[in-house]
């Protein structure tokens, strides 16, 4: 197994286990932070897309199993992984089609505004899909908006702290 494959797999295990054992048991203002989206955000851009979708599918299934959400997390993770490239283009103004640049390069070489825009787009979209499918009703629109906004804010703050604590400077 090459270094990049091993690194991706270890990050996968670490983030998923952290979500299951720690963050699923935390409630802040009635929402549980979803830090597992960090794995998608730091997933290497030069990695095979099929493997990215496979990792997201497996992560979603594992999280659904431990969260009793019946495929909702899997669905929202797969949609978010598909939209990641478009959010990079929107937030950073371009995307390297040759895949020479890494996600860390985009994050390191850009302004704070662009970084925050990218994180908000990723987390907000994921949370909106997650809670919309969970509610599956327009009658609960205010509940979906409240949960989406609170969960996005809390997840971004805790994810940033999580990255600062556990990942090196290259991953930021």
Cite the ranges covered by each PLM segment.
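Terminal, non-globular segments
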Residues: 1-172
């Amino acid at each position: 197994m090459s270094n990049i494959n091993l690194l991706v797999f270890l990050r996968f295990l670490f983030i998923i286990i952290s979500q299951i054992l720690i963050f699923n048991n935390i409630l802040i203002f009635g929402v549980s932070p979803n830090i597992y989206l960090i794995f998608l955000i730091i997933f290497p851009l030069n990695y095979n897309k099929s493997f990215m979708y496979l990792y997201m599918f497996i992560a979603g299934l594992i999280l659904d199993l431990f969260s009793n959400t019946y495929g909702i997390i899997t669905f929202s993770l797969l949609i978010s992984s598909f939209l990641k490239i478009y959010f990079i283009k929107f937030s950073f103004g371009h995307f390297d089609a040759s895949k020479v640049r890494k996600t860390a390069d985009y994050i390191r070489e850009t302004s704070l505004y662009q970084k925050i825009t990218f994180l908000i787009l990723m987390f907000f979209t994921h949370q909106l899909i997650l809670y919309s499918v969970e509610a599956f009703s327009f009658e609960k629109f205010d509940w979906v908006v409240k949960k989406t906004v609170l969960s996005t804010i809390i997840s971004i703050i805790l994810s940033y702290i999580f990255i600062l604590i556990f990942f090196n400077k290259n991953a930021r």
